[in-house]
């Protein structure tokens, strides 16, 4: 309706401009009058509330566009951009790690040695090596050196063992493995099956523990420290990295990261979060993941910032170290912000210079609590999958929002919410066979339109071609077009702000209503004292849909179930209150702090299988009661009155 009205007004005003002698002021008056007469006051009201935001975003987006387009036009690459920073500031500190400070020049020299070692050992442009190493400066130097000669690096999660580790190395078609000294035991368990050359980093003059492995430190000491000749052969659309998905629902998938893709990710974060090269970034995230390795490290490599990294995230040390190193920016992902809230209050909570936290995954339920406690002016929440092209950012700190899109010039940013079937998760189609766009307030799957050979909109997919095809929906708005399916359900308000609602497949139906597991998780976690909690639907014999089940990590068994139920009923509709509770000692999480619930979901509420404490919401008694074998049998036989 808005677009039709706008077209009508533009048409009439254009006709008047061409056929009359009205002044510019008169034309403006006619335009406003026409718009109001045709019901455009709502659009004027929307414009008043959103145009300042959209104009600021537009200016920043143009900077992103200019940077990425120029780089691809000149066929540049990430190492070359880094080397330009080396030329300008060779002695500036790039990385701080424990008691070490690495300058741009030191990173450049180390990465040159890696690059020339790869060439001398016979690895060529397009080959892949797997990097299995803990967070440390050598990690970044190693993949940067490989990138200088066109060797692709598969960044392997250092928490993986056995089959998942073997899978990741093999799916990337790795020709060698570079392993950190601390991870040799894990690699020894898989080496016989992998049968690949191994380089071990960090051994110094000590022989590696892995049989037949090469001592990388010794090899680098004699490698050429000058820039490799092969650097000029590396282009913007060459593969640079494989970064693996978190693997919350199965084995990780290897997402293809090209130089242009890496640049877009870090450039988008830099400009939309209004960072500068003077910023010092506290980055405690795993460097094998896109948040830490692309968004975070990209600020160093491309934008000349300084970053503080650590071997593993520590909630107790976060603000202490951020203050110690005068950090101005902090990074988060997943449940990290909640972990920080769970630490005992201390003076360092506010004795820091961090002006903005940027990342993705902070829950709406703790947003304002976090900003208040840690004196945080801005949370720059962004949304975007490692491999995806549906990317947005909340640049003005709207609580709970993961980003926004313009509402007046809606199609400037080619990302949309489309309606999906609640049962199958497949896109719904209109009578012409095309997708249906959601209205404000309607949940839908977030998609981004694909444009081939465009650095901002091309979907490069995964190493597995079948997995790539599953993420593409065809014939979205017209015959032949295509979009990337995020797999996430979002909802948009009237001002264009988008809010994460759930993963497709995580929403379940109970008592004729849709229940968002993500929304219920946020409430359960908060009322349980910010404990780890996951929510999922379980099948109940004789009942339609799936009943909600919440699993709460409470090793001390300190949760008061009576108080919990009171708070749940205050904050949730009746149908969304979990019917079952499971009290856990611990729960598995990914390296990016996403809680795993697939195994729990498969176990359901089976009292004979589960050894943890289980409870059932008895409607007659209005309380959670222990799920005894007898009660389990009654529910399973359909005799519990559900």
Segments from the language model and where they lie:
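Conserved AMP-binding/adenylate-forming
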Residues: 3, 7, 14-32, 100-101, ...
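Conserved AMP-binding/adenylate-forming core of the ANL superfamily
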Residues: 70-79, 83, 91-136, 140-144, ...
């Amino acid at each position: 309706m808005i677009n039709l009205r706008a077209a009508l007004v533009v048409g009439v005003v254009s006709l008047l401009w061409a056929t009359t002698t009205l002044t510019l002021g008169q034309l403006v008056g006619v335009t406003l009058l026409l718009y109001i007469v045709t019901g455009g006051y709502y659009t004027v009201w929307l414009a008043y509330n959103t145009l300042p935001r959209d104009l600021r975003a537009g200016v920043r987006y143009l900077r992103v566009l200019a940077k990425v387009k120029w780089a691809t036009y000149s066929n540049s690459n990430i190492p070359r951009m880094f080397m330009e920073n080396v030329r300008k500031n060779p002695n500036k500190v790039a990385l701080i790690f424990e008691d070490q400070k690495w300058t741009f020049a030191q990173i450049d020299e180390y990465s040159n040695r890696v690059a020339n070692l790869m060439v001398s050992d016979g690895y060529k442009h397009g080959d892949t090596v797997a990097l299995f190493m803990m967070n440390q400066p050598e990690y970044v130097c190693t993949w940067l050196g490989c990138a200088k000669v066109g060797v692709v690096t598969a960044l392997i999660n250092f928490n993986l063992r056995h089959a998942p580790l073997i899978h990741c190395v093999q799916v990337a078609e790795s020709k060698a493995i570079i392993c950190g000294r601390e991870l040799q035991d894990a690699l020894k368990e898989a080496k016989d099956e992998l049968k690949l050359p191994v380089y071990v980093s960090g051994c110094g003059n000590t022989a590696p523990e892995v049989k037949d492995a090469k001592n990388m430190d010794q090899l680098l000491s004699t490698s050429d420290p000058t820039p490799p000749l092969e650097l000029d052969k590396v282009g913007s659309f060459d593969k640079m990295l494989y970064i693996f998905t978190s693997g919350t629902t199965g084995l990780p998938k290897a997402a293809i990261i090209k130089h242009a893709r890496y640049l877009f990710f870090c450039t988008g974060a830099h400009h939309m979060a209004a960072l500068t090269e003077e910023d010092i970034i506290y980055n405690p995230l795993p460097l094998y993941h896109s948040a830490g390795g692309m968004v975070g490290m990209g600020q160093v490599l491309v934008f000349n910032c300084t970053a503080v990294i650590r071997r593993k995230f520590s909630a107790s040390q976060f603000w202490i170290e951020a203050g110690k190193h005068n950090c101005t920016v902090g990074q988060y992902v997943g449940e990290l912000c909640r972990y920080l809230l769970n630490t005992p209050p201390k003076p360092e909570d506010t004795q820091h210079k961090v002006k903005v936290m940027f990342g993705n995954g902070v829950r709406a339920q703790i947003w304002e609590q976090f900003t208040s406690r840690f004196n945080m002016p801005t949370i720059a929440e962004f949304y975007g999958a490692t491999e995806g092209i549906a990317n947005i950012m909340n640049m003005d700190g709207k609580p709970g929002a993961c980003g926004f899109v313009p509402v007046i010039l809606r199609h400037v940013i080619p990302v949309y919410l489309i309606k999906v079937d609640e049962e199958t998760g497949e896109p719904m189609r209109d009578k012409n066979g095309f997708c249906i766009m959601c209205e404000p307030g309607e949940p839908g799957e977030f998609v981004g339109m694909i444009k081939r050979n465009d650095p901002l909109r091309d979907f490069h997919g995964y190493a597995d071609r079948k997995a790539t095809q599953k993420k593409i929906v065809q014939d979205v708005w017209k015959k032949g077009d295509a979009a990337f399916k995020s797999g996430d359900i979002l909802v948009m308000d009237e001002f264009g702000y988008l809010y994460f609602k759930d993963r497709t497949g995580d929403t379940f139906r109970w008592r004729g209503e849709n229940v968002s597991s993500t929304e219920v998780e946020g409430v359960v976690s908060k009322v349980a004292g910010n404990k780890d909690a996951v929510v999922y639907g379980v099948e109940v014999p004789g009942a339609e849909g799936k009943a909600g089940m919440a699993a709460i990590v409470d090793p001390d068994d300190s949760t008061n179930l009576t108080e919990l139920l009171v708070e749940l009923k205050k904050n949730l509709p009746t149908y969304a209150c979990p019917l079952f509770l499971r009290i856990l000692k611990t729960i598995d999480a990914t390296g990016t702090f996403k809680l795993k619930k697939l195994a729990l979901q498969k176990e359901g509420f089976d009292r004979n299988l589960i050894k943890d404490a289980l409870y059932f919401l008895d409607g007659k008694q209005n309380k959670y009661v222990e799920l005894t074998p007898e009660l389990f049998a009654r529910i399973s036989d359909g005799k519990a009155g559900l």
